[in-house]
Amino acid sequence: MLGSKSIIAVVAIASAIVTGVVVIVVVVTLSVVLTRSSVKDTNSIYVPDVITNDPQMTNEMDTLEVISSSKFSGTKPKEWTMKYTKYPYWRCGLTFTNEEKQNIVNENKEYMNSLLQLINNGSLGRMPEKYGGDKQFEANGVNWEADRLEVRYGLFGRVFGQRAVAWAFPGEIVTIKFPKGMSYKGIQVGIGKCNHNPSDQWLNVNNWSNDRMPIDSIGFDLGLNTTQPYIINDTFKIGSPFGGMIYLRSDTTFTNSFYVTFSNVGRAPIINYNITTNEEWNSVLRNAPGNVAEIRTPGNRLVLTSRNIRSLEDAQYISDFWLKAISISNYAVTLENIPITLNFDQRVDAGAAVAYVGRWFTQNPSDWAAACVGKDGLINYGNWGPLHEMNHHMQGTYLKGGNWGISNPGEETNNVMTSINYILYTNIAGHRNQGLSGWNYVSDGYSTIYKILKGENDQPHLRSYVNMAHAFGTDTLIALVKSYYGLWYENNFESKYSIKRDSTSAFCLLAALVTKRDTRYLCSLFKYDIQSNVSEAIKNMNYPTYYPFFNLYAMSYNGNYYGRPYKIPYGRTRLNFTATTAIDPKATSVSYTIKSGLTKGKLERVEDNVYDYTPFFGIEENDTFVLNIDCVVNGEKVHIEQEGTFELDPHQVEYEVYKDVQTRDMAQALNIIQNKTANDTGRASFFGIGTYNDGSMQSMLVEKGKLIVPKSGYYTLFMKADDLGRLLLNITGEYEQLLDVKTYLGGYSKTLNGSYATVKLEKDVGYPFILYNLNTGGQGFIRIGYCYHGTEESSVDVSKCSVSDIGSSMVLNEKVKTGAKEPEFQIPPIKYSRPTRFLTNAYRTIPKCLNGDDACSIKCLSLPLKHDDSSKCSNMFDDNYSTMYHSRWTGQGTTFPVNYTFEFSENVTFNNLYVHHRRPEDSWGYFEMFVKSPETGEMELLEKYKHPKSTTTELNFQKLVTTDRVQFIVYNNSNGGNYVNVVELSFNIKETFKNYTNSFGPKIKSTGFKKVTTPGASGGYLAVNEKEGEGSLCFKAKVTKFGLYGYRKTTSGKFRVTIDSQPGEVTSQSYFSDSERTLFYAHTFDETEANKVHNICMEVVEGTVNLDIIGSS
């Protein structure tokens, strides 16, 4: 190596290096979630206070700042004069003939198509309230009293598509101010709910909705000739008789950020990933006046009506969930610079929902929206529909070969991606003791394979893929997905084996290569045909056979942890390992051995592989076990080790069954059972007792537990029963009879005395109850339902109740101690991070020459003869792409080879060379590069390069080079011409990093720096020193190298980096590229200092400096 590694400082250059994109994969364990202390990350050693990778960090978000606020004037816009006497609006309850519908469509269309003209001449009006003008967008009204705002919206240009900005009040005009003189090509402004284009809205009366006006949204392309007359002094005005969300759309024309000001708007419930905090959400945005809402992450956006999001409290969880969801597909399949839009609208023109893959949006029913923002539901039940539609966009359409999968690739792809989400980020498998229905089977190993081993042909294709995740991990499943693009084409398998990419043979082959297992037995279970040459190839790999056998109680497979703890009830439970293991029915010599564990309870053997287990631990504890499964399959011994964790299920209540109670009177039945012993027991996971059939015998069932409510206030409890029922509830310290149903009641009644009662209950208090059900023969049941009225007694109105069954979350086992809390589900961290993107990973280490040759510190010791006096040495270093050094081309032109020799006033260090030519045909051809050795003073050959005909030349060197003299011997023009030219020549440091940390991260000590709102910056903020020449940012790092990234500014200050109290040189903050975020400093530690803990500070010396992120490896 020439020279030595050192602290490298920074100066600036022009733009033209390709932005480096580093794909970050953060592999995390689920040890907290799995409650397995033995599961550890062996790839890292935790050092307190040392910066680490921030997997949540992204740099693709826009920003919004409120500039000013004013009170409502008190005067609403004038009402639009409408032609007819009734119109559709939210829950209007009206009916319309086809003629009425068509008339309204025509009027609606005419008015919306005239919006810009109406705004321009001052004739815009609002839809009258008496016709439902305040009740569009699924709203019960408009908050007219809300403040009117002026906001500054920062659009991050590298990401295109539509974004929600703010709320427009019905009939009011919003003024939009764009940057002076900007081009409007590629800019659109929309207003309404979801689709800005009327062609995306159903205007056929056969698809009429009584809940809304036919056209409630419209958009305007500002680049069109028909729109541009309405742009005056860079100002555009928009409004609608219905109001709506204001949207700003950009296309790929824009690469840098710009700011747009919106006046006379209201806030809307908009959640921006990694920007919107729970504090801001709950104090400002949650109840903002906008009746349309948006959740936005770098990879997707959900547009829904605000009524679905008002009850949300944890906004950060919701945006985090949706980023995690899209990031799985982004990592496994494809990544685009436009978020996928999930619209929740009433207009769905195919099936339950539809994905417009080519247009990058999905249309979902509006009644799917609430579940997308329900935290408990997403954790415990998932949300298959919207995830499925979203992942349709990840079918591989944009990658080599298109879709992958067996038989039906388009569906298989998105279902596999959704399954990974269920496995990683939900607690669905934690409820498998209650059984898993629908798509939820994908979350658990046993549930995924059980039906296949039973011989059922239920979704075998998806099960065969998902099974890999449970046995080998989601990394392996994603590797299998990637193999359809990588291994498949790299090895030309289609030609080699004469098989198709969507065949079962292809699956078996790729699965074997990825898992390093013999998959022939697995494929036989799924009844997959394997072509003979493929089968022979798998056999010759000599991998061990994979046997997909899983126990229901377990949550690991031979060391891979995939599941969740298994819930068992209070009291004794029977563990039947034979009945709860999915295993080949033809297997022989089957044995189940509890190798270790189950020490926190009483374990009693009943028979082979069957035990009674009585837990001694409480709700906040657990017990663990290791289970060995041994058997013989096809003459081969099979050994599988699975681990599991038992937790108590506090939401299972117990009931006793007293048989032969010969009375139809509840009072007599209670007397009869006083001195009797229960004949049987049962359990329920809700408030009530499910279907119980006692045949011709009468029976009395008694359930005891505790009622717990999520909110304090007034509740009306309802009972339905077959046949008789009674509820005692302890509110004041004594049981009191609350409900008494004396006859069969198949549904909840709001009028039958004794079947309902209203009580005031406090949140998180366990109210003991006793529930009696007298079944007079045959099939019986009893259920308790509820209606919540709020905290004021005056709001109680039973007639308006919408009664819901009381489910498991509102009942507790009577043995749950007062104050004991169920362990909260620990939300797993993101495993597949979205890459930190749009970085320029280089900066220039030579000075600029802005004032001609005489003032240039770089000396040209040798150059080819120049064409004319406009060709100056300094032109190659002036960061100006309109100047150059052009060799002679007239006469006989330039005689090759030619010599370029440059001398620097001091040593420069670089690992990257960048040369820019005017045109491809002007470029260097074959050349050799020499540098002067600092040790010997001799010129030494560094590189030989045959440059193809192109505008740019970029060379990367494996090690840092330090020298004060560089020479290029150019032997020809790449196009055979008799000249060459150089527009810009730069020597740079270029680095990429594995980890990235926000400049305002918790382990960064900031002194004298403030947050400056900046689109595209991490978290929406840039760290900028408050006072010129003052401020520092310090951190600890255990790395081999690190780098500092900031935003390019026309003027910048100076700083020094101090490492372990050793100050570096004072340098200027300037950049290589015109890209917004670029590297401006890097340091590589030598071998003796690498991976030691170092104290690092960036200290401002002069002017203003900014920092966005810190990269490290």
UniProtKB/Swiss-Prot annotation:
GO cellular component, one term: plasma membrane
Main location: membrane
Domain annotation PA14: ranges: 648-800
Domain of life: Eukaryota
Residue intervals of the Peptidase M60 domain: 159-473
Pfam family, one: Peptidase_M60
Transmembrane recorded as keyword: yes
Residue ranges of the TM segments: 7-27
Carbohydrate-modified residues: 121, 207, 225, 233, 274, 533, 576, 622, 675, 679, 730, 753, 880, 899, 907, 972, 995
Entry's Gene Ontology molecular function annotations: transmembrane transporter binding
UniProt-listed SMART domains: M60-like
Cellular localization per UniProt: Membrane
UniProt keyword terms in alphabetical order: Glycoprotein, Membrane, Transmembrane, Transmembrane helix
Membrane topology per record: Single-pass membrane protein
Protein name (Swiss-Prot/TrEMBL): Antigenic protein P1
Native organism: Entamoeba histolytica (strain ATCC 30459 / HM-1:IMSS / ABRM)
